[in-house]
Amino acid sequence: MVISDKQTLRRCVKQAVRRAAVVETLLNFDAARGEMGIKALTTSISKAQGLTPLQADAAAAFAAMDALEMPIEDIPRAALIQSGYTREAYLREILDQMRAKRVFACVSIRDAQSAVFEDDRIAPLLTLPEDFFAPGRYGVEYARRAEEIRLAAQQCGARDVLIRQFDEDALRFCVIPACEDECLRLHVRLDTRAQADGFLRQLDASHTVRALAFGDETVEPMLIEAAATRRRLLVRVNKRIPLALEKLGLRFVPYASEADLPEQMLGRWITAREAIWPALCDAYLPLARCGYPLTSEAIARDVQALFGGHFLMDDDNTHEAYQE
């Protein structure tokens, strides 16, 4: 069906976004052993001293409970219902409600050997602790740290590694060489433009490493511009989605929950997608108005690519890229 009016466009885009299978690129949760459930979820909500909870995390928590058909008005009963699930079944229900295609759950490099997941949609995101590159008496032994990364990736089957604390020397002498040797994709948080500059220098110096970079709103425009000319770089954008659509088309990641609980992940996705689809509508509207043959099928394909298709395509091609 060719779309020619704004209301049809809005309805089509909203439906495509709500039905899309999504890739979660950062879940801060021990999927193998971490505590989850209604009790943990409600404990995470900031108390409002009897007033209406208006915090974003409260909205996400209640959105998750609603999606899981848990009674929001009766927390003890919701906890009782949840207790009837096995851990595996409860996690599977969360992923099903989210329409999760893949979830990258953090696995500390120190726990890699024991990381086992009960659902094959969960993938390990090998995570380097902030003190991993803390210098000892003789400085930092980068070769030893690189070998630890390679061994941990092999132990848990990780193809992705996250460095939370930017360190240009660590990237140059350890992380990027380890990614090259073990065919890992690098996830990196960048908090300043100087860090982004340093990271881009290291990425350009490597001819094979693929990366997913993200940062706060002030860094996002720089990362978007960088990704426009670098096929090995994907950026995750939370605030500057209209700019990313303009500069990158659909080749970026528009969301990550960075949640501490699976239920938070579900709820944050439900609330985030309601902010994403209007931005997509605004991007499509000029095409619809000028007579471009925009169809609902094309929009569904676009949305699926945006919410994980490009990321998984890069994931599938990573090993081939390292062999080029």
Go through each PLM region and give its residues.
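Metal-cofactor-binding active-site regions of metalloenzymes
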Residues: V2-E182, D204-T208, I224-E324
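Generic detector of bulky aromatic hydrophobic side chains
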Residues: T218-V219, L234
